[in-house]
Amino acid sequence: MMWQRAQGLREINDSQQEGGLLLCADALETDLSAYLGQVQMIYLDLPGATGQDYSCKLRVGEKGWETSRQAINLPAYSDYVKPDDQQYLHDLRRMLDLSHALLTDSGSLFLHVEANTLARARLLMDEVFGENNFKNQIIWTYQAGGRSKKHFSRKHDVILFYAKSTAHFFDITQVPVTRKEERSNHLKRHVDEHGRSYRSIKTGGKEYIYYDDEPVYPDDVWADVALLQQKDPQRTGYPGQKPQALMDRMLLSTTKPGDLVADLACGSGSLLMSAANNQRHFLGIDKSPVAFAVSRKRLAPYRLVCQAPFSDHGAMLDASSVPGIGYYTVGINSYIVPEEDLVGFETQPKGLPIRGLDLVDQWCAGLMNKGVFVAYASSVRQKQTPVLQTQLEVPLLRGTVSILLIDVLGRRTLWTATPVM
């Protein structure tokens, strides 16, 4: 049976695991007044100033997720033209002003910047947050990347860390790191009366003792967090994705369980995942429909409120809904997209035909009530689950059985078998 389109105000992903709010919107054009002074930590990794366009390499179908040999490139975002671009500086200043207003008095901001924008970003941060609230210029160094003969190869990123005020909350004991063994080479080793091993050194008339079992904490050079490798299960294909370990260190040191954190250009949703995994609430915003789709997929196991426009295109969905004992069994049979919709997209391999349910990246089944779609079950394609489930169960509750589907082009549609009253 062919289903028809429906419209909704928002989507709620029903789950027992606490999550947060995900918006497909421009943070600078969104009313966030309800969150003023409520956010404990903000992470920003904004478009840079290289003049480049970036695409998301999304795997397609069961074979694509199993072997990575089938994919489609989707436009993700574009950088500003150059570092002194007035639009870049204007938008960065507005984003910093918004972040300052959203933060609690004890809150923190981490701004991820590139080498060619660092100086200007630091000056703007000093203007908005105050020089006295500067905490660290964190160097995240890594070994991956290319080599250059025109200059020293760039092997680090910079993260500017600022507090909102002197009431700043910071707890480094939440982020211990592995002790560096090479530090002990020039120290004498001992064992105390309790059997604890330690090393010592005398200098300046004083003896310094370091117990082997004492925790150690990171400084402002982070060399122990690697870039995501090509086969890392975290990898989504979204450009610029950062590893969870990087997000965890910033989040755990500046927030407590139950706090609200935000990413106003959330991209692949790494900070949001860190928040959900560590019992923090999150607010994620990105104006890219592709970023929204990638983040939504990663956050599918968590309770999630989504607000994003629905696409209006010529696709058709063949689906079914069969009532049973306590549940509807909802199934998708086929999804048809006009061939012209796929024209112009680069695929791997070149000319890859994408048809049928290979066009579906994720879908969920649920009930519609008064414009609100509540998803009770979902299936998403990812490395761990390359095969799309074609049947899901929805409880026999009040509401109209509906399907929310996101295809491989990042287009989000809502469907129902009967008109929504």
Predicted regions, residues:
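Short glycine/proline-rich turn/loop motifs
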Residues: I72-K82, V225-T236
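SAM-dependent methyltransferase catalytic-core segment centered on the flexible catalytic loop
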Residues: D31, G37-S108, I172-I201, N277
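Conserved SAM-binding loop and adjacent beta-strand
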Residues: D232-L246
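Conserved SAM-binding loop
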Residues: F110-L111, L264, G284
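Conserved class I S-adenosyl-L-methionine
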Residues: G258-A265
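Accessory, often C-terminal, charged low-complexity segments
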Residues: M1-R10, G19, L28, L36-Q40, ...
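Glycine-rich SAM-binding Motif I of class I
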Residues: G269-M273
